[in-house]
Amino acid sequence: MIREYTEQDKEMLKDYLDEEPYGRAILTAVEEYGTDSPFQTVYLDVRDGKLEGVYLCICRNIMLYCKENKVDIDFLEQMISVMVPDKVAGRKDNVNIVSWLLTDYQAEYGKRLPEVCGENGELLEWMTEEEKYGGEWSVLVK
């Protein structure tokens, strides 16, 4: 079941996201901007008490992380119908699942966290340069 993140989920979220750079990017954004931010919303996919995926909506961008690649495509389809993202970023296998929903987007790959711009076009910086590198990032760009 997909639901919005609350402060009570903090330890579960930290434990789930701390292993890979994709998860750490989401965790750092949550820690930097909090859950009360008007430009950021975090959704959790919790099944039988176990966290299966995390979806961060930040300034018309979506970052996702699902360890076992169990991306909830129905949830993303609903989300995209409400808010068409500028970018969708995450681990390559996670983003590849989303690509069939966004057929007019261009796929890009890299070893670095993609740039995310705020509502006024300013670059959002929530990680150090060293933290931005690692993993095989995939980004769908409009």
Task: Please annotate each region the language model reported.
Residues 12-15, 36-37, 97-101:
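Short, solvent-exposed polar/charged micro-motifs at secondary-structure junctions
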Residues 4-7, 45, 138-141:
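Extended, compositionally biased low-complexity polar/Lys-Gly-rich tracts
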Residues 1-21:
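Short, compositionally biased leader-like segments
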